[in-house]
Amino acid sequence: MADRRVLFVHAHPDDESIETGATIARYAAEGAHVTLVTCTLGEEGEIIPPELAHHAADRDDTLGRYRIGELAAACAALGVTDHRFLGGVGRWRDSGMMGAPSNLRPDCFWQADLDEAAAELVKVIREVRPQVLVTYDENGTYGHPDHIKAHRVSWRAYELAADPAFPGGEPWRIAKVYHTAQPRSVLRRGVEAMRGADMPFTRVASVDELPFGCDDAQVTTEIDARAHLPAKFAALRAHATQVMVHEPWFALSNGIGREVLGVEFFTLKAGTPGPRVAGVPAGEGGLGGPRLLETDLFAGIG
């Protein structure tokens, strides 16, 4: 068993690459055991290439199966060799955006029984025994029901996995739990850089137009994975039904450009913080400023 083991829990194929791709690639390259759990197949996603539009949920409804291949290619690019779908392939369906009729499907992830879904994640935790768990914040980053449910399932599994009274395998206490974070100052720099950039995507006028972002003060941890940007770009390109790439930018089906980050940010929500040091300067993609940050998800773990 590898000395360092980290579990990433994401809602759909492509989320792992967009939010944590560089971090995943860095730890995989360093020899850590990286486990990726994806909660749905992403069946309700909007499709970018016209020639693949027939896979859509309101047509052939085969997008989920197609995206399995995209995710496999992304995992290969990132160096992930341990990937699982929560509860098995297709156990829970993509719920679609908040308020969509697909939220009401009994087989969608949003409608999943919390303890039932968490029990499936407990199986993974007790098998892999990760020291670190990474998932989303309470709002699921931007309010998507599957992201919110992934957050809830992750935290319930974190509790149950450590409970000796919960059946199925030896208990395991995860040492540190992180939420992904997208600090507004970093997003603001990206918005400003796009104003004069040569790219085919839509530019937003202000960071306030983006449906995500957190106060800089919430960030506790900064992972410098700039050396692994090529892997992140390759993983993003693998998700061709969902992502368009024009380095150093990318866009989803809404066409709004965003910067691909090689420095990724997190908030420690459970566990003891490790040593904090000066991070990457703001001019090089980091948070910058006088605050000291963790620079390793495993910092402080004995």
Swiss-Prot record:
Keywords: Hydrolase, Metal-binding, Zinc. GO terms for biological process: mycothiol biosynthetic process. Zn(2+) binds at H12, D15, H147. It comes from the Bacteria. Its EC number is 3.5.1.103. InterPro entries: GlcNAc_PI_deacetylase-related (IPR003737), LmbE-like_dom_sf (IPR024078), Mycothiol_biosynthesis_MshB (IPR017810). Gene3D superfamilies: LmbE-like. Its cofactor is Zn(2+). It catalyses: 1D-myo-inositol 2-acetamido-2-deoxy-alpha-D-glucopyranoside + H2O = 1D-myo-inositol 2-amino-2-deoxy-alpha-D-glucopyranoside + acetate. It holds the Pfam family PIG-L. Binds 1 zinc ion per subunit. One of its GO terms (molecular function) is zinc ion binding. Catalyzes the deacetylation of 1D-myo-inositol 2-acetamido-2-deoxy-alpha-D-glucopyranoside (GlcNAc-Ins) in the mycothiol biosynthesis pathway. Belongs to the MshB deacetylase family. This is 1D-myo-inositol 2-acetamido-2-deoxy-alpha-D-glucopyranoside deacetylase.
